[in-house]
Amino acid sequence: EIRYSDWSSDVCSSDLKDPRKTTTYGVGQLILAAAESGVEKIIVGLGGSSTNDGGCGAAAAVGVKFYDKDGKEFVPTGGTTADICKIDLSGKAEILNKVEIVTMCDIDNPMYGPTGASHIFGPQKGADEAMVLELDEGIKNLSRAITEAIGKDISEVPGTGAAGAMGAGMIAFFGSRLQMGIQTVLDTVKFDEMISDADYIITGEGKLDSQSLRGKVVIGIAERAKKQNKNVIAVVGGADDAEIDKAYEMGVTAVFPINRLPQDFSISRHHSKENLAYTVDNVLRLIAAKDRKSVV
């Protein structure tokens, strides 16, 4: 039996906009409950969280202990990871050692630094510039403590910065391996076989930006399609002009943003369905016109 945990459903809340205070504790409880229910494999999907605690909350929920410089035990949040002095893994629930835990994420960001958890994703969670720096220093300190606890530096492992550095926490505290979510999905549906006789592949996401280039759906599909010389059309809510050329190099044939008028997102989001339909209709008309010309 396999149990799945969807990160954004479990820990994301639009009402919680302070990543210094949010915690992954509940996710740890869910993982432990799944293990105790007798499952053999747990798949955790990371992304869309409101947290930045490096998985410390989840770890605490399964028995991992964190101590500050005074030797006092506490449960770190994003705002207190800088206070971690020592991590003790000896109390972790033994049943977790009997379960295979796989963690899927769609990005390859490291734990900290300019492309790490706090700098790239912190602003999406309500962090201003000063808070981003604070959170980043905390994750950097957590990385140091993890290295001391497990005897290995995992800070540069691709994906450790996912979901507020929970990727790192899943490796360090749960003995999990990280794998790209999109690759897992594509393998499951036999994508390479599916597109073998396709002329065009239409995919999309909310915004094509620097995060997209680090392994999300559009690029994951484009890289597979490129190996078979297939055309990939990305229909997106918006696109970062600075990243489009890179997307083309990675296998995307064309990018079509759906917004038809210069409107603020608060307005355009109410017209997403019709804008999407209008854009896809135009894409299909263009493809049909090309095919008719080829026949002539």
Predicted regions and their residues:
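Oxyanion-binding "anion nests"
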Residues: E134-A198
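Glycine/threonine-rich beta-strand-loop-alpha-helix active-site module
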Residues: K21-L32, E36-I43, S50-E100
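Structural beta-sheet core signal
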Residues: V44, T103, A234-V235
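Carboxylate- and glycine-rich phosphate/diphosphate-binding segment that chelates Mg2+/Mn2+
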Residues: L16, T22, K72, I101-A163
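Single conserved hydrophobic/aromatic residue that forms the stacking wall/gate
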Residues: E1-C12, K293-V296
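C-terminal non-catalytic interaction/assembly regions of soluble proteins
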Residues: Y200, G206-R292
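Glycine-rich oxoanion-binding loops at beta->alpha junctions
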Residues: S9-E36, L178-D199, K207-L208, I267-S272
